[in-house]
Amino acid sequence: MRAAPPTSLQALIEALKVLPGVGPKSAQRMAYHLLQHDREGARKLGDALRGAVDGIRHCTRCNTFTELEICGTCSDPERDATLLCVVETPADQVMIEQTLTYRGQYFVLMGRLSPLDGIGPKEIHLDRLLARATDPELGGPASEVIVATNFTSEGEATAHYIGEMLKARGLKVSRLARGVPVGGELEYVDAGTIARAVMDRRTL
């Protein structure tokens, strides 16, 4: 009879497999490393995960991650509330912030349209985006909406859908310039390239 790992160890391995790019072997290596060489690090990791899961929420205005009802970017009086940049993820927002060239606000979709995966307009909060872009109580109407979804097929489809939706309301909509490679994701593009793509954006 083959010996099985302890139940709690197996549970740890299964939990680690939820991380992107982590398969069974990698998860097993991580679990054994933490238990064998870095139990204090494992405790810190567990505490940090619990703190983030319990303490992080979505900003009621832009949908990004925050510990407050309204995030620091949305509550910053020095940001241009009428200039709105739409991104897929909080990581994409961070990349644009690192360019130090954009002083508007954001809306974070938390995904992109993917009908085959059951992800439609509702799942990426396009109703909230429309409200943010048009409702004066939320900072609207926007003077310009920059669609900064990734240049993947799903990202392009999402950009087209958002562009048509907002232009139908009379809003100016622009798209990042093609400095970002086709198929590229903002999270993996250098800040200089993103800065140029924002500055050279084209009107849809």
Curated annotation (Swiss-Prot):
A zinc finger (C4-type) spans 59-74. Keywords: DNA damage, DNA recombination, DNA repair, Metal-binding, Zinc, Zinc-finger. Residues 82-181 form the Toprim domain. It comes from the Bacteria. One of its GO terms (biological process) is DNA repair. GO terms for molecular function: DNA binding; zinc ion binding. InterPro entries: DNA_Rcmb_RecR (IPR000093), Rcmb_RecR (IPR023627), Rcmb_RecR_Znf (IPR015967), TOPRIM_dom (IPR006171), TOPRIM_RecR (IPR034137). The keyword Nucleotide-binding does not apply. May play a role in DNA repair. It seems to be involved in an RecBC-independent recombinational process of DNA repair. It may act with RecF and RecO. PANTHER family: RECOMBINATION PROTEIN RECR. Belongs to the RecR family. HAMAP family: RecR. This is Recombination protein RecR. It comes from Cupriavidus metallidurans (strain ATCC 43123 / DSM 2839 / NBRC 102507 / CH34) (Ralstonia metallidurans).
